[in-house]
Amino acid sequence: MTYCIGIKTNDGLVFASDSRTNAGLDNVNIYSKMLTYDVGDRTVIIVTSGNLGTSQAVFKSIEKDINDKKASISLNTCKDFEQIASYIGKLNTKHSSPDGINTDSLVLGSTFIIGGQIRGQDLELYMVYPQGNYIRPADSKPYLVIGEVKYGKPILDRVITPNVSIGDASRCALISMDSTLKSDLTVGPPIDIAVYKKDQPKISYLKCLNTSDEDYSKVCNQWSEKVLQVFDTFPKFDWEK
């Protein structure tokens, strides 16, 4: 399994994804689930959850189309992010369901979060489903999560709004990821994180973090300590007295 996050704020975008895949307790491997592309007038960040074979095939097709000048469509030629979402959706179903969308689409398909910016256009964030369709997040909850979402979602619900700073969004993403790592053995480090600041030509921060790395540990360790400190200040119930 995996856990991936995409956050959109007024200032930019934050993406995070784990790197663990497993097919049982005795078969655990590490694969990056993030693809980044910032060339020319566009920056695109993609994270994925689901069937590893399908995800890797989609990433390979994206890279092949970028390098093929005769390709009818690629990340280079899409006019906007809705077209990028549609393009990735078609690649998804092509590799998971070559005979057409059916029940295999859910079993063999993958889910993607894509986001970024094309010069002169707004920041964008989309989720692409195994069946090839796609959605944007709600304005009031400007984030998307895929994979093992139940452990890391509460902190996102409490913190993430359109007005949150991109720094706070990044810290929130790390805490969300750490909460999931602590509760689900199918999600594991290293953690890929990408930060894109609005209207910039390149990704601002892109790093693969282990839990011992300072950028990760100084946030997550302090969060754990502060939670315990606050917990100790709760008033006693009357029946405890």
Where are these regions (language model features)?
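Short beta-strand scaffold segments in enzyme catalytic cores
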Residues: 2-8, 13-15, 110-117, 124-126, ...
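Intrinsically disordered, low-complexity segments enriched in small residues
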Residues: 5, 167, 182-241
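Hydrophobic residues embedded in beta-strands of well-ordered beta-sheets
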Residues: 13-14, 44, 122-125, 134, ...
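Internal active-site segments that recognize and position negatively charged phosphoryl groups
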Residues: 94-126, 132-134
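Conserved short S/T/G-enriched processing/targeting/catalytic segments and their helical context
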Residues: 4-108, 146-164, 171, 218-240
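Surface-exposed interaction patches
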Residues: 175-181
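Gly/Ser/Thr-rich active-site loops/lids in small-molecule metabolic enzymes
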Residues: 125-154, 211-222
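Short, structured patches in soluble enzyme cores that scaffold and shape functional sites
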Residues: 48-50, 114-118, 127-130, 148, ...
